[in-house]
């Protein structure tokens, strides 16, 4: 692998993870209902991604896989904002980060994929981590927020499954449509109150075009230049850094069980990615 493309890929996935990791802090800085935040965040992300994607809309294939990606993405982002407003940033991102575990389960149930030993260990380890995160008391709305965050992770897992069947469709175009769907999902709960202050508008543009849009553009740059394993492992910086920014800026400290459970979930996902890469490397020999 040439050094320059590899270095660009590493810089891109690091930039993507850093960009995504600012979500929790930005959500806390905006004093608006969650679905109003999500509507504007997805609107600005849709416009940004459509602008960057440019031409190529004729290559978008209307198929069950593409529709699955669009709808599951829309639910993922809307639910994630609700979760961040209902529980701690650490709980929200760590529970959403269980998406790869849902992929294993859905692969076995929906696609009849036979689970390997690494899959079973990953699911078991993630369940232990989840129980620790969910056991931590996080206020009157924390239980609901945890459930919403877990559902967001489930939807993200469904999106990953659907992406296997939508590989012919350009990613940025599909994500732009997913953000449009997220806007439409949130619209009934926001209508007719669309008013914003100047400060709120600034943070929402930063969330949509910067935190979400730039993150996905950098991801596409990294995917073209790095092995899938390295993309997956560096992306794990997001759930690690997300609560750090919130703690430094807002003093929101994750509990001991949340940190322990989160560490288990992140390590389990990293272990599974390494085991999967080793399996494919062995098959290529």
Spans of features found by a protein language model:
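C-terminal-most transmembrane helix of multi-pass membrane proteins
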Residues: 2, 42, 135, 236-285
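Membrane-interface interhelical linkers
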Residues: 1-15, 45-68, 114-120, 138-144, ...
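Glycine-/small-residue-enriched transmembrane alpha-helix faces in small-molecule transporters
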Residues: 1-38, 71, 79, 124, ...
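Hydrophobic transmembrane alpha-helices of multi-pass small-molecule transport proteins
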Residues: 49, 73, 105, 115-135, ...
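Specific transmembrane alpha-helical segments of multi-pass solute transporters/efflux pumps
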Residues: 19, 56-91, 95-96, 132, ...
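Loop-to-transmembrane alpha-helix entry segments
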Residues: 60-64, 93-96, 112-132, 139-146, ...
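Helix-helix packing/entry segments at the starts of transmembrane helices
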Residues: 92-98, 163-181, 212-248
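Transmembrane alpha-helices of multi-pass small-molecule transport proteins
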Residues: 29-75, 102-106, 155-159, 175-192, ...
């Amino acid at each position: 692998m040439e050094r320059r493309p590899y270095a660009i890929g590493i810089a891109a996935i690091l930039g993507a993870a850093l960009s995504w990791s600012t979500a929790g802090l930005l959500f806390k800085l905006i004093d608006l209902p969650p679905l109003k935040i999500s509507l504007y965040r997805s609107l600005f992300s849709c416009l940004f991604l459509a602008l960057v994607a440019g031409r190529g809309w004729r290559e978008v294939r209307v198929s069950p896989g593409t529709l699955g990606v669009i709808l599951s993405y829309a639910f993922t982002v809307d639910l994630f904002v609700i979760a961040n407003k209902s529980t701690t940033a650490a709980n929200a991102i760590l529970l959403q980060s269980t998406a790869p575990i849902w992929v294993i389960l859905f692969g076995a149930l929906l696609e009849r994929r036979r689970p390997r030993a690494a899959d079973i260990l990953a699911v078991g380890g993630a369940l232990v981590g989840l129980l620790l995160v969910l056991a931590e008391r996080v206020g009157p709305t924390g239980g609901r927020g945890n459930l919403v965050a877990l559902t967001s992770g489930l939807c993200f897992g469904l999106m990953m499954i659907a992406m296997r069947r939508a590989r012919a469709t350009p990613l940025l175009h599909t994500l732009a449509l997913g953000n449009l769907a997220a806007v439409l999902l949130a619209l009934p709960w926001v209508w007719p109150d669309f008013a914003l202050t100047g400060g709120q508008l600034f943070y929402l543009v930063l969330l949509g075009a910067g935190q979400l849009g730039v993150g996905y553009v950098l991801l596409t740059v990294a995917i073209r230049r790095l092995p899938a394993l390295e993309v997956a492992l560096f992306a794990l910086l997001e759930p690690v850094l997300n609560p750090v920014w919130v703690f430094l800026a807002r003093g929101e400290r994750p509990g001991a069980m949340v940190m322990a459970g989160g560490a288990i979930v992140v390590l389990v996902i990293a272990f599974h990615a390494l085991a999967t890469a080793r399996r494919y490397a062995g098959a290529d020999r």
